[in-house]
Amino acid sequence: MTPTHITSLAFPVFTQGLALGLGLIVAIGAQNAFVLRQGLRREQVATVVLFCALADALLIAAGVLGMAQALGEHPGVARALAVVGAIFLALYGWQALRRARHANALNATAGATGLGQGAALAQAAAFTLLNPHVYLDTVLLVGSIGAQQPAAMRGWFIAGASGASLFWFALLGYGARWLAPWFARPRAWQVLDGLIGVTMFLLASLLLRHALAGI
């Protein structure tokens, strides 16, 4: 198999992981507000960004590889999970489109006390690992979708989904001073939610088609 052929196969898988990762992580939430706040105050930005991105990458890899091994022995369960995943993505997309109809904004100004590296890591860990949605999103949802990919392509899917986390957290942390006024505008989040909704519906249709093709 030539490098060009490998790239042609890997790029759509990488892009799917990237789109899924961005669709799930771009949301109004405590973790994003924390990263943005650290960026605004220029406190422990590298520490917080790297921790959040690395934690996501490890959870995504564990989810994809673990689910792949489990589902490889039960193809029927794999198809069922693909259908469930498609339904979840469609519902997630529908919720995003609903949010796009209402004004909202991200508040990154709460908390005025400066943080040392240890305290910043502790808070980043709490916002990341004590949030039950992180396990639903990264381990179960991303893991089950990534496990549907051919074995040789799973690394590309993991790279895409992990790259989305690194890109988003770096954008929040290092672009905070430019992004904060934009994120404070409800209209910006309405546009983002609209794009997320469309992306989730597209991914749901791809996943459902994959599930039905295996029947």
PLM regions: where:
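Membrane helix-loop-helix hairpins that form the core translocation module of multi-pass transporters
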Residues: 43-120, 175-178, 198
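Hydrophobic/aromatic residues within the transmembrane alpha-helices of Major Facilitator Superfamily
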Residues: 18, 22, 26, 57, ...
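Membrane-embedded alpha-helical segments of transport systems
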Residues: 50-62, 130-135, 163-169
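Final/C-terminal transmembrane alpha-helix of multipass membrane proteins
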Residues: 192-211
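Hydrophobic alpha-helical transmembrane segments of multi-pass membrane transport proteins
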Residues: 158-176
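Juxtamembrane transmembrane-helix termini in multi-pass membrane transport proteins
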Residues: 2-79, 140-156
